[in-house]
């Protein structure tokens, strides 16, 4: 099978990146040292090519009401242009089709950013719901492989770290209006050479920074200028350790179509209290939450916490969904679905090969804005 490639593929290869198959995409896992890339984001600034993710623009007079029924979180929270909201999109059984970010620009104009591996299915689902509800929303995917003819494809570069925003501003003065952006807000600016840039104060690392949504034809120039300004290229390996430390779920790993958001630490993104109906609401209300979603820190030596390892507790067994060695903490950490009677601070055991190693249950996240929140 031929892998799909982002517009930055040739640049990754020229930089000596180790490339891997990531859900059918040819993507950089690192450029030499995953730990150095991780630490650059925690202490300075790093950048990620996330152009495999898909922007989907929604337009029309009924867009808000359509999204009120499509998403588990409530888009009525979005009243200021540029404001963003994290949400799950559920099926009728309450399973997670995808997790995404929705941006509000005007009553007739919203933007979604969805995951790479789910993008085609997401678009199909959104179109089907649009038809079923008679919402008459115009749905326009913007990734190169799915953008309609005549529509400008978009690419995405995430610039993350304590110095990320100042390096973006100094490299692209046109983005300076974004200096007043609060977290989870976006601004659209015009660059004389690079065209329209959406600057979003969002990310997937637990650090401050921007995600830049740019014309695909100009993303190489943007990447090279940021690289020249000292923003370090970082691959999927560092992205995974950073998001794990930050307590951020990965679709397909920590939740999927067979998982309720209530069992994946995402109850805060689900609006069950208001009268608003949405796809999956009845199923979630009927089933409730069956498990907790918490963090683990390995206390014994002799292993690394990994997905699918069994967690043994006095209240019954649980399972790790994501695990890694944390460069920031120098400890092995994990997310786990655990029985409801397990408490933060409890000691549990994790089956690693033929051994049972002790781990401590902790509240997520592990690290935020460069500071350890656990010990």
UniProtKB/Swiss-Prot annotation:
Q: Which GO terms of the molecular function aspect are on file?
A: aminomethyltransferase activity; transaminase activity
Look up keyword Ribosomal protein and say if it applies.
Answer: no
Catalysed transformations (reactions): N(6)-[(R)-S(8)-aminomethyldihydrolipoyl]-L-lysyl-[protein] + (6S)-5,6,7,8-tetrahydrofolate = N(6)-[(R)-dihydrolipoyl]-L-lysyl-[protein] + (6R)-5,10-methylene-5,6,7,8-tetrahydrofolate + NH4(+)
GO terms classed as biological process: glycine decarboxylation via glycine cleavage system
**Has the keyword Transferase been applied to this entry?**
yes
What keywords does the record list, in alphabetical order? Aminotransferase, Transferase
What's the Enzyme Commission number for this chain? Answer: 2.1.2.10
InterPro entries from the xrefs? GCS_T, GCS_T_bac, GCST_C, GCV_T_N, GcvT/YgfZ/DmdA, GcvT/YgfZ_C, TrmE/GcvT_dom1
| Alphabetized Pfam families for the sequence | GCV_T, GCV_T_C
Q: What SUPFAM superfamilies does the entry give?
A: Aminomethyltransferase beta-barrel domain (SSF101790), Folate-binding domain (SSF103025)
State the Gene3D superfamilies in the record.
Aminomethyltransferase beta-barrel domains, Aminomethyltransferase fragment, Probable tRNA modification gtpase trme, domain 1
Cellular component GO terms held in the UniProt record: cytosol; glycine cleavage complex
Q: Which NCBIfam families match?
A: gcvT, PRK00389.1
Q: What binding partners and quaternary form does the record give?
A: The glycine cleavage system is composed of four proteins: P, T, L and H.
Q: What family, per the record?
A: Belongs to the GcvT family.
The protein's name is Aminomethyltransferase
Its source organism is Cupriavidus necator (strain ATCC 17699 / DSM 428 / KCTC 22496 / NCIMB 10442 / H16 / Stanier 337)
